[in-house]
Swiss-Prot record:
InterPro entries assigned to the protein according to its UniProt record, in alphabetical order: CDK, Kinase-like_dom_sf, Prot_kinase_dom, Ser/Thr_kinase_AS
Subcellular location: Nucleus; Cytoplasm; Mitochondrion; Cytoplasm, Cytoskeleton, Microtubule organizing center, Centrosome
UniProt-recorded name of the protein: Cyclin-dependent kinase 1
GO BP terms, alphabetized: apoptotic process; cell division; G2/M transition of mitotic cell cycle; Golgi disassembly; mitotic G2 DNA damage checkpoint signaling; peptidyl-serine phosphorylation; peptidyl-threonine phosphorylation; protein localization to kinetochore
Phosphoserine found at: S39, S178, S248
Gene designation per UniProt: CDK1
Positions carrying N6-succinyllysine: K245
Amino acid sequence: MEDYTKIEKIGEGTYGVVYKGRHKTTGQVVTMKKIRLESEEEGVPSTAIREISLLKELRHPNIVSLQDVLMQDSRLYLIFEFLSMDLKKYLDSIPPGQYMDSSLVKSYLYQILQGIVFCHSRRVLHRDLKPQNLLIDDKGTIKLADFGLARAFGIPIRVYTHEVVTLWYRSPEVLLGSARYSTPVDIWSIGTIFAELATKKPLFHGDSEIDQLFRIFRALGTPNNEVWPEVESLQDYKNTFPKWKPGSLASHVKNLDENGLDLLSKMLIYDPAKRISGKMALNHPYFNDLDNQIKKM
């Protein structure tokens, strides 16, 4: 830690306090995440350290790079590249009645998908994607932060400040207690974020797991074994769930064209096996008119 100085506290992350810092010799500005673990006495589990070390290998223009992993007084500090703005803050800063430019929505979605495809190809899931951990710079680049941390540390139910971890972007298979899940969980989250890029509003903003599920069911219909084989045998599926009929996504997401709505609907397919993959999403006609500069990134 002697290589870095803390400049200021910039927030509370899922796992602990987040600081803006500076490398003493190079002057590089960094983000320092202090990881606060449940069992402080035992120090950092070796499995977590192994997982985290692997994340240093994830180098991609749309992934926030993990530059260093440091220990101090049995506390773990993760040193990341610094970006000052997250997607949530940016969406909140757009004046009422105005929306993000549709070409920027497209560019951001494409970049998010490029980042996710890169990680999925290396068998790393995110599991906790949300606008707060999508960081943007002033050149139009968006980067995914906190990759792989869920696997290293688990996803707490509450942040250590007792703020509840958001459920709005969580996939139905996770909400229904599926023990086995894979890369489609991240695609679902990106779908909900896509809708929010277009409308500035969370697509499904539940305040409990059951409220979250019911908001999804009201919009997309209550799933059954016909549309999603074996869903009825998932741990938290109840035959007593109200049977809503599928509605139209277009009524919830006003600012997307036909191609955008088609891609969104494929990202929000209930059955994870039928949900579009990141790779297939990148080749969807929605991106046909995207600037080639972005495609080459």
